[in-house]
Each structure stands twice: as structure tokens, then as C-alpha cells.
Amino acid sequence: MIKNLSVRPSLIPREQRGSVESQVCYLTGRIKRLTEHLDLHGRDYSSQRGLWKIVGKRKRLLIYLFKKDRLRYKSLIGQLDMRGPR
């Protein structure tokens, strides 16, 4: 399942590590970890800023994928169980 790939990038084949899907999975994992951190440390403003930067980057990648290939976009959104920007 793709949810586990964000934790272990070594499971992704070498030729697919730069793909949009793998980047979104990686960023989703980072977002989850930062969200857990911010639940404990709510006033950590530098982490909040980093979280917003990562969320923006993931959003841009999802918009790119939506424009290029909607089937891959819908598949990725379904596998990660998240709402897309569109």
C-alpha cells in the first residue's frame, strides 16, 4: 500500500523515486509527522511555517498531476485517502 512508502523510500524502485506520486507520498508522510509534532508543541512557529511550505509544495504537485493525467491523480488521491485541491 502506498501509505507505507512514505515511511520507507527504499521500497520504491529506483526509476520511480522522482515521480510525482512518490514525491507526494513522501511529502504526505512529512506532513503527518509535523502535524503530530505540532499537536504536542502548538507554539512551535518555525515548524508551522515548514508545514505550510510542505503543504504548498504538495498542492502544486497535485495540481500539476491533475493537469497532466487525471487518472493517475484520482488513483493517487484514492490510495492516500485524502482530498485533492480540486
From Swiss-Prot:
Principal subcellular localisation of the protein: plastid
Record keywords, A-Z: Chloroplast, Plastid, Ribonucleoprotein, Ribosomal protein
A GO MF label: structural constituent of ribosome
Gene Ontology cellular component annotations, sorted alphabetically: chloroplast; ribonucleoprotein complex; ribosome
S-S bonds: none
Single biological process term from Gene Ontology: translation
Domain of life: Eukaryota
Keyword Phosphoprotein appears in the UniProt entry: no
Family annotation (InterPro entries): Ribosomal_uS15, Ribosomal_uS15_bac-type, uS15_NS1_RNA-bd_sf
Compartments, record wording: Plastid, Chloroplast
Pfam short name (any one): Ribosomal_S15
Family: Belongs to the universal ribosomal protein uS15 family.
Subunit details: Part of the 30S ribosomal subunit.
Protein name: Small ribosomal subunit protein uS15c
Gene of this entry: rps15
